[in-house]
UniProtKB/Swiss-Prot annotation:
Keywords: Aminoacyl-tRNA synthetase, ATP-binding, Cytoplasm, Ligase, Nucleotide-binding, Protein biosynthesis. A motif ('HIGH' region) lies at residues 131-141. It comes from Bartonella quintana (strain Toulouse). Belongs to the class-I aminoacyl-tRNA synthetase family. GO terms for cellular component: cytoplasm. The gene is argS. Monomer. It comes from the Bacteria. GO terms for biological process: arginyl-tRNA aminoacylation. This is Arginine--tRNA ligase. NCBIfam families: argS (TIGR00456). Its EC number is 6.1.1.19.
Length: 585
């Protein structure tokens, strides 16, 4: 039950059935009416902007219209009181029996509460991580990995059919560099002295075991056979080894993709997928032969002062046309990207989501252009850019140097602080905002550490049930037993917690609509904080404690409140990819 949506519908229905019309007698446009929690909880339980958004079209001032709307709602038995806040917002306070019924509904739905049927089975492809297979995942990949995974879980929760996809960039120059870097480590494993890693090769020590493995498998054969053949063998082994490493890194974060799509597949059969893509674009008038001026202040790697095969991407919103085939007949990276999008489009997804690093900001327009050209403007495309993660230790920056091969890996972070803190904290800022990750803060046992505070709330809830079992000498308390006594929940603090719980479906809906899973993390912390605040009041006032040894019925009612909190913490944390704690260790 979404309390806010239900009251929005009530208000709209009341207006539709009323004699309130526009200035010229026309029906009202009710689409901008919303019902939300008031900014100040002391102002009521619900607040609507109905009078504010309709006043001008009706020809009344907002306050006068608010009075008319209040008149329409005055006979609603669920409303305790209703008033107007300047200049025309309507604040509503609901009855305690309404909130008792609300928590009854929550308990009946269990962990399915908040599971709004928004997706209706529509198919969405979410591509995330897609790190180059040239080494272990570093902490910079971590944020996009968590964002993509939680967004996928969130969309799945409300009924979308999700495909989690990883694009393996295994056909570009970086693979050549990787192969030469591994060959160097191979020669080192054979006993050759390697003084310094040449500029441009990967210097990380993570390649040493691969060099040793090749030496064990091939002895010195790779130095005696044809160089191209040796390089081909090393490439295959290196890509396999790097992707195995990356899969293990992702598994450490509890991330598992459905599909790993190899870029090399696009080049199979004489690059048939790319050729077919260019043919399709040609038929639709997007391909021509020509020259491009050198890009100002940008990478000129794909620029040549010669005739090339160009994609007329400016026709579909790009800043400049893009090279697909160079003058020597070789394909650009972008040609493979367009072919990859075409492959996705031909798999008939209703929407395609790309999650990229902030350094890909300049890539968004060409992505959108290729989507319009390939799909005839029918594809729904969403692109998200995840900003950088800055590492700190006790407030001091952690220095990293990719050139020196010294960077903090994803596995390093997970092994030091644990999977759950990493997942939660990577989500604890909007993805477009930079994120500071302090190793000390995320392991701190205080309210300033969001994941600790949320898990502590879950553990405390479980402890209340254990206390009830001990005091009342019962093995468990059934849902029906708790529901039967919910009318005993009358304290304002209890009603406040029920109101906080009732926001969950609204938070889920907003997080899905805006594709902002950080809203869920914020809500879970907010709910945990409200719970802890009530718990602390019980330390000062025995009557507010959840278990009342001399009043079993009140205790059962409060256990119902605890169960509802547990259900939502468990549900929300599951979407984040975290198991709710039953006790703190």
């Amino acid at each position: 039950m979404n309390v806010f949506k239900n009251f929005e519908k009530k208000i709209k229905k009341s207006l539709e059935l009323s004699d309130i019309k526009g200035k010229n007698g026309e029906d009202l446009n009710l689409s901008k009416i919303t019902v939300d929690p008031p900014r100040d909880s002391s102002h009521g339980h619900l607040s609507t902007n109905a009078a504010m958004v309709l006043a001008k079209s009706i020809g009344l001032n907002p306050h006068a219209l608010a009075e008319k709307i209040i008149e329409l709602l005055k006979n609603d038995s669920s409303i305790d009181c209703i008033d107007i806040a300047a200049p025309g917002f309507i604040n509503i306070k609901l009855t305690k029996s309404f909130w008792q019924d609300a928590i009854k509904s929550m308990l009946k739905k269990g962990t399915s509460y908040g599971r709004i049927p928004m997706g209706q089975g529509k198919r969405i492809n979410v591509e995330y991580v897609s790190a180059n297979p040239t080494g272990p995942m570093h902490v910079g990949h971590c944020r996009g990995a968590v964002f993509g995974d939680v967004l996928s879980n969130l969309l799945q929760f409300v009924g979308y059919n999700i495909t989690k996809e990883y694009y393996i960039n295994d056909a570009g120059k970086q693979i050549e560099v990787l192969a030469h870097s591994v060959l160097l480590r191979y020669r080192e494993a054979l006993g050759q002295k390697i003084n310094e890693i040449p500029e441009g090769l990967y210097p990380g020590e993570y390649l040493i075991p691969l060099g040793q493995s090749l030496a064990q498998e091939f002895s010195d054969q790779l130095l005696t056979i044809d160089k191209d053949e040796a390089l081909s063998i090393v490439k295959e082994r290196a890509i396999y080894a790097m992707m195995s490493m990356i899969r293990k890194d992702l598994a450490a974060l509890n991330i598992y993709h459905d599909i790993f799509f190899s870029e090399r597949m696009l080049y199979a059969d004489n690059a048939r997928a790319i050729r077919n893509t260019i043919n399709d674009l040609t038929l639709n008038g997007y391909i021509y032969k020509g020259e491009l001026p050198p890009p100002k202040g940008q990478n000129t790697e794909d620029w040549e002062p010669r005739e090339q095969t160009l994609f007329r991407s400016t026709d579909v919103g790009d800043d400049q046309d893009r090279v697909l085939v160079k003058s020597d007949g070789s394909y650009t990276y972008f040609a493979a990207d367009v072919a990859y999008f075409r492959d996705k489009f031909n798999r008939h997804f209703d929407e395609m989501i790309y999650i990229l690093g902030a350094d890909h900001a300049g890539y968004v327009k060409r992505l959108e252009a290729m989507a319009k050209a390939i799909s005839g403007n029918s594809a729904k495309l969403s692109v998200f850019l995840c900003q950088l993660v800055k590492l700190f230790r006790n407030g001091h920056p952690v220095r990293m140097s990719k050139r020196a091969g010294s960077f903090v890996t994803l596995r390093d972070v997970v092994e030091e602080v644990g999977r759950d803190p990493v997942r939660f904290m990577m989500l604890y800022r909007k993805c477009e905002a930079p994120l500071d990750f302090d190793f000390a803060k995320v392991t701190e046992q205080s309210k300033d550490n969001p994941i600790f505070y949320v898990q502590y709330a879950s553990a405390r809830c479980h402890s209340v049930f254990r206390q009830a079992q001990e005091i009342f000498r019962i093995e468990n308390v059934s849902n029906d037993t708790m529901i039967a006594h919910l009318n005993r929940l009358t304290d304002d603090n209890e009603i406040f917690l029920i109101r906080k719980l009732s926001e969950y479906p609204r938070i889920i809906e907003q997080a899905v609509v805006h594709k902002e899973p950080h809203r869920l993390a914020f809500y879970l912390y907010d709910l945990a904080s409200s719970f802890h605040a009530h718990w602390n009041k019980g330390s000062d006032n025995f009557d507010l404690r959840f278990i009342q040894p001399d009043d079993k019925e009140l205790s059962f009612a409060r256990l119902g409140l605890i169960q509802a909190i547990m259900n939502i913490l468990s549900s929300g944390l599951a979407i984040v990819g975290i198991e709710a704690a039953t006790e703190m260790r």
